[in-house]
C-alpha cells in the first residue's frame, strides 16, 4: 500500500494544485480526501465520483454530442455515410450547372448613319490633291550658278534670282557694265578704274569715270539738273573710249533726279 501511495503522490499533488487554481479547493483538503480514499479500511468503498463531489458549486453538465441534438444526428450520419459510399464507388453524378444571370439590360443602339450630303468644298479639294502631281526633287532645287573659273571648275552656289550668284553677278552678259564694255562671258571682273576725275577737268580723249560728279553738279536743282545731266551724257559719250555708253551709269543719273 505504501508503494501505491508513493507512486501516485506526485499526480495527486499536481491534481491538488489544479483544483486549487481552478476551483479554489485547498490542496490540504484534496490530499486528505485522497488519503481517506486510499485508506485500507475504505478501499472496498472507493468510488471515482467521490473526487468529483469534492469540487464546490453546481456541476456543469457536459455538452450534448452533435449526434444527440434535435434531428441533427441522423442528417450528419446520413451525410457521412453518403460521402463514404461516393468515395468507394466514385461519384458519377453530374456537377450542378451554375445559374447564369440573365442580362436584362437593353441592347446598345447602333450609331445612326449620317445621310447628310457631303459639302462640295472638301470633295473639290480632294480632287485637286489627287490631280496635283507630287513635286519632284529636281524642280524644288534651284540651278547652280553658270560662272566658270579659268581652271574649268564651275561655281556651285545656287542663285536666288537669275542665273548667276551675287558674287559672280558681273559675269552675266546682261549685266549693265558688260553691255557697255562687251566683256566676254565667264571672265573675271574688270579691274578697278583709276582715281575719279571731276567732270570739269576732263579733256578730249581723257578717260572718264561715270560715277564721279562734281559738287556743283550734285547741288543742282531738279529742273536744271535734268537738263545738265542730259548735256553731260552727250558730252561724256564723246569723251568715253571706243565711243560707248554706260547705260547703267546714265540711268542712275536720271534716277537721281
Swiss-Prot record:
Residues 86-119, 182-206 are annotated as: Disordered. Residues 196-206 have a biased composition (Polar residues). It comes from the Viruses. This is Uncharacterized protein 110R.
Amino acid at each position: 500500500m505504501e508503494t501505491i501511495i508513493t507512486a501516485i503522490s506526485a499526480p495527486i499533488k499536481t491534481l491538488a494544485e489544479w483544483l486549487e487554481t481552478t476551483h479554489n479547493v485547498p490542496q490540504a483538503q484534496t490530499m486528505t480526501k485522497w488519503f481517506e480514499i486510499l485508506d485500507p479500511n475504505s478501499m472496498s468503498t472507493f468510488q471515482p465520483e467521490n473526487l468529483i463531489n469534492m469540487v464546490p458549486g453546481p456541476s456543469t453538465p457536459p455538452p450534448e454530442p452533435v449526434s444527440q441534438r434535435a434531428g441533427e444526428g441522423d442528417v450528419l450520419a446520413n451525410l457521412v455515410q453518403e460521402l463514404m459510399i461516393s468515395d468507394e464507388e466514385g461519384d458519377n453524378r453530374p456537377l450542378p450547372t451554375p445559374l447564369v444571370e440573365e442580362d436584362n439590360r437593353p441592347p446598345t443602339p447602333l450609331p445612326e448613319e449620317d445621310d447628310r450630303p457631303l459639302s462640295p468644298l472638301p470633295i473639290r479639294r480632294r480632287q485637286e490633291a489627287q490631280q496635283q502631281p507630287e513635286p519632284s526633287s529636281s524642280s524644288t532645287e534651284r540651278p547652280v550658278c553658270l560662272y566658270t573659273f579659268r581652271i574649268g571648275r564651275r561655281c556651285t552656289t545656287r542663285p536666288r534670282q537669275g542665273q548667276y550668284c551675287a558674287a559672280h553677278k558681273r559675269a552675266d552678259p546682261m549685266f549693265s557694265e558688260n553691255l557697255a564694255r562687251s566683256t566676254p562671258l565667264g571672265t573675271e571682273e574688270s579691274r578697278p578704274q583709276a582715281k575719279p576725275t571731276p567732270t570739269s577737268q576732263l579733256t578730249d580723249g581723257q578717260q572718264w569715270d561715270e560715277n564721279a560728279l562734281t559738287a556743283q553738279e550734285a547741288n543742282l536743282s531738279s529742273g536744271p539738273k535734268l537738263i545738265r545731266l542730259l548735256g553731260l551724257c552727250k558730252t561724256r559719250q564723246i569723251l568715253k573710249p571706243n565711243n560707248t555708253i554706260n547705260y547703267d551709269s546714265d540711268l542712275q543719273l536720271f534716277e537721281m533726279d
